[in-house]
């Protein structure tokens, strides 16, 4: 009996030599474009197409892909990836081209004519899109195959396709996001196995499903086969076959077939009717593996769903869903695999038993468990005592009770599952409904520091730099107000417990700064002085003395501060209070021990690459909070190294909101005069157009390059003239494939050259002249984190307009 792979290869050669296939051969010198009618090569029947497929939800970018051409949603079965050790899906912008050159080379090029993908086949006489869904490139002579998509699968296999040991399927991140996902089907010499993976590093956790292993036989697996009857099985060298799927197989004549490793980690075999009907047509899963992925557990990692969530399986449609417990919410409603976070402040370990019982209670949920997350257990015990022991334990977030046994668990919770077979009752600790504890909801949880509580009414917790903006905008936006100082009554100290700002007297701040003696720096609207409060801790502060004041009404100011004053983020400098006494206007901030990024980065000693990476991510996350996580969007308008401060742990914090703009709900742009600092301002500042959050994205792109290279954007004394302006030079280095020149002498960065290239590409996307071409700051953070693939950035001349 011939091995299955040999039979498949023989069948493929027959197809290549048939008249119908030859009629569809792709000739040398042929090309495809992203737009227009010539964007794909079809198989003889028209069932499959190979070419440019628009990204779902973003028609400006394309995959080089194969798809079911006669199905309305054009379901992709293959898409090109990079040739890196951890291949990433390739996305190209409009204007890209795929050439099958006269020398027999298939080459994908972006609008700048830079090659972004090449399968490595040379001297090919022709290529073909076959009716099997396989795209093949013939070897010289035309009798054998040099390269084919069936040997380079992504997340899907088709009928007649086989996977041999060493080949793998990688799930997508989401159905509409083709970035590498969290699950892998790996063909090994001893078995076929499904793994959970770490994103973005790609390391494997424990397998959650595999074929049986015979310890007495080595190299026992031959292939995973999707045969012409619709069966999917793993063939062994001893002749046995292990069925991967066991669904009711539909006919090949009436149905399209595929098998996909889906974003939820389930390997599903699907069918789709070829003939249109009055019924709604869709892919139907006829078989799955594993039968219930919610039962999968890993010793490391979050499990099937993200941390602090639990998995539910619906057997009626073979679908899984991830759920947050009550009073928890997803970090990202779209990317639910990132897990859940509490919508409340976690229990302080300073609370005694009485206080804990007064402030916290439990939500009870049946048939739920988080296996492997317990750190303590008791037996025999009743539920009331289990409840009490968890309630007084500040580490205990959840207690699980079953048959007189109690398990205590702390965050993060992993391997969460709900099902009728889970004979457990969970007690989830939450604040009591009448508790005065504020919910954090969309902001990061503030972990209270015992020393700060000592300050009591002197420094209320949770002060926000956003309140800084609210006050600064009131004091500085003279363009938009006509009310004089005498019309404004001094702001009284807040009696609202939700307004965590202290109203300082001028005398207090004059004493704290020793008569405004030590200057820390100058901002857009005043001078910043170092000070020290006369409290029990001797807290150091930074006091900004505002000049050139113009006001809006006190009522509008109070409403705005009360609206956003409770928010907080680790990457924003925290505002502690203010002074609004007579004609004096001062702002009080937390003091940043390590000064500004400007001084830290350009002082002559190159910081570690790993630290620069964390600083870049911190600035991006701070901007993400301003742009997309606040209830009211904030445009900073003056992002530069001088306005990025570093605390004692070298965490980057955005400061100086004196030029910021606040957008109303549903407002996406504003019109205002030029703001910002030369070398960091976006081109649209010099045009009569609306200003959007993309001006901050542009400024971040400049800072990102400065962090990569440890030099300022403009250095007219540079050794080489082409290196004088960093944005020019970085663009040239990237286009020439020499980003290593940007980190010359930095051994740590060169060891991470792939990440350097990734960061440079992100920066060049941020520096696009057209604002709509720049990614959102959310997309920027995803690309920096490695969660999203990065298309090749167009060659933009935006930097010219940065220096009027």
Curated annotation (Swiss-Prot):
Pfam families: B_lectin, Pkinase
Compartment(s): Membrane
GO molecular function, one term: protein serine kinase activity
Membrane topology according to the record: Single-pass type I membrane protein
Catalyzed reaction equations: L-seryl-[protein] + ATP = O-phospho-L-seryl-[protein] + ADP + H(+); L-threonyl-[protein] + ATP = O-phospho-L-threonyl-[protein] + ADP + H(+)
Main location: membrane
Keywords: ATP-binding, Disulfide bond, EGF-like domain, Glycoprotein, Kinase, Lectin, Membrane, Nucleotide-binding, Receptor, Serine/threonine-protein kinase, Signal, Transferase, Transmembrane, Transmembrane helix
Entries under Gene3D superfamilies matching the protein: Bulb-type lectin domain, Phosphorylase Kinase, domain 1, Transferase(Phosphotransferase) domain 1
All ranges on the Extracellular side of the membrane: 24-458
Xref: CDD domains: PAN_AP_plant (cd01098)
Cellular component GO terms held in the UniProt record: membrane
Protein name: G-type lectin S-receptor-like serine/threonine-protein kinase LECRK4
Organism: Oryza sativa subsp. japonica
Gene that specifies this protein: LECRK4
């Amino acid at each position: 009996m011939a091995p299955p792979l040999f039979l498949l290869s023989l069948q493929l050669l027959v197809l290549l030599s048939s008249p119908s296939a030859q009629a569809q051969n792709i000739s040398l010198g042929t090309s495809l474009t992203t737009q227009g009618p010539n964007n794909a090569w079809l198989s003889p029947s028209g069932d499959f197409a190979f070419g440019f497929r628009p990204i779902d939800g973003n028609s400006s970018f394309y995959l080089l892909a194969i798809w079911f051409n006669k199905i309305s949603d054009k379901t992709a079965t293959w898409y090109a990836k990079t040739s890196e050790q951890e291949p990433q899906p390739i996305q190209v912008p409009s204007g890209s081209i795929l050439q099958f050159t006269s020398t027999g080379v298939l080459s994908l090029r972006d609008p700048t004519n830079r090659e972004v993908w090449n399968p490595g086949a040379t001297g090919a006489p022709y290529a073909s899109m076959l009716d099997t869904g396989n795209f093949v490139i013939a070897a010289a002579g035309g009798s054998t195959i040099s390269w084919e998509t069936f040997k380079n699968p992504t997340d899907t296999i088709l009928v007649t396709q086989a996977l041999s040991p060493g080949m793998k399927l990688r799930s997508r991140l989401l159905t509409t996001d083709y970035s590498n996902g969290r699950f892998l089907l790996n063909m090994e010499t001893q078995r076929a196995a499904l793994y959970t993976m770490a994103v973005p590093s790609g390391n494997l956790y424990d397998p959650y499903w595999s074929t049986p292993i015979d310890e007495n036989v080595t190299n026992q697996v031959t292939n995973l086969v999707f045969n012409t009857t619709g069966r999917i099985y793993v063939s062994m060298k001893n002749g046995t076959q292990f069925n991967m799927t066991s669904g009711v197989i539909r006919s090949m004549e009436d149905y399209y077939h595929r098998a996909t490793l889906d974003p939820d980690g389930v390997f599903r075999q699907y069918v789709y009717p070829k003939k249109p009907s009055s019924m709604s047509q869709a892919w139907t899963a006829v078989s799955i593996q594993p039968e219930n992925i919610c039962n999968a557990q890993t010793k490391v990692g979050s499990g099937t769903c993200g941390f602090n969530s639990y998995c539910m399986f619906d057997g009626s449609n073979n679908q899984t869903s991830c759920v947050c417990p009550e009073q928890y919410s997803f970090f990202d409603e779209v990317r639910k695999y990132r897990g859940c976070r509490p919508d409340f402040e976690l229990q302080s370990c300073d609370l005694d038993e009485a206080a804990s019982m007064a402030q916290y209670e439990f939500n009870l949920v049946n048939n739920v468990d988080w296996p492997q997350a317990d750190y303590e257990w008791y037996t025999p015990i009743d539920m009331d005592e289990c409840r009490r022991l968890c309630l007084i334990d500040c580490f205990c977030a959840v207690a699980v009770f079953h048959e007189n046994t109690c398990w205590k668990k702390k965050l993060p919770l992993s391997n969460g599952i709900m099902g009728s077979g889970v004979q457990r009752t969970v007690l989830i600790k939450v604040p009591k409904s009448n508790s005065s504890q504020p919910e954090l909801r969309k902001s990061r949880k503030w972990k209270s520091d015992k020393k700060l509580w000592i300050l009591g009414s002197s420094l209320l917790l949770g002060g926000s730099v956003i309140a800084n903006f609210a006050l600064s905008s009131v004091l500085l936006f003279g363009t938009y107000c006509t009310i004089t100082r005498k019309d404004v009554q001094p702001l009284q100290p807040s009696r609202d417990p939700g307004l965590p700002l202290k109203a300082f007297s001028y005398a207090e701040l004059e004493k704290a700064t020793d008569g405004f003696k030590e200057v820390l720096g100058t901002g857009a609207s005043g001078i910043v002085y170092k000070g020290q409060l006369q409290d029990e801790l001797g807290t150091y502060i930074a006091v900004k003395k505002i000049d050139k004041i113009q006001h809006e009404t006190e009522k509008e100011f109070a409403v705005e501060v009360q609206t956003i004053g409770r928010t907080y983020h680790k990457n924003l400098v925290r505002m502690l209070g203010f002074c609004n006494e007579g004609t004096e206007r001062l702002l009080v901030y937390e003091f940043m021990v390590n000064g500004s990024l400007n001084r830290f980065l350009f002082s002559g000693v190159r910081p570690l690459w790993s630290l620069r990476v964390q600083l870049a991510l911190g600035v991006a996350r701070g901007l993400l909070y301003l742009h997309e996580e606040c209830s009211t969007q904030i445009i900073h308008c003056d992002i530069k190294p001088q306005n990025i401060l570093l605390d004692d742990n070298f965490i980057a914090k955005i400061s100086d909101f004196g030029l910021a703009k606040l957008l109303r709900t549903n407002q996406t742009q504003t019109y205002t005069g030029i703001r910002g600092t030369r070398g960091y301002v976006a081109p649209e500042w010099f045009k009569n157009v609306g200003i959007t959050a993309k001006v901050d994205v542009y400024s971040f792109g400049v800072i990102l390059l400065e962090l990569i290279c440890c030099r300022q954007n403009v250095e007219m004394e540079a050794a080489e003239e082409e290196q004088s302006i960093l944005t020019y030079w970085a663009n040239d280095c990237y286009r020439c494939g020499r980003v290593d020149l940007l980190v010359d002498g930095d051994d740590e960065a060169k060891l991470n050259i792939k990440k350097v290239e990734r960061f440079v590409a992100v920066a060049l996307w941020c520096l696009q002249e057209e604002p709509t071409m720049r990614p959102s700051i959310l997309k920027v953070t995803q690309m920096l984190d490695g969660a999203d693939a990065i298309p090749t950035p167009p060659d933009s001349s935006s930097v010219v307009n940065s220096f009027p």
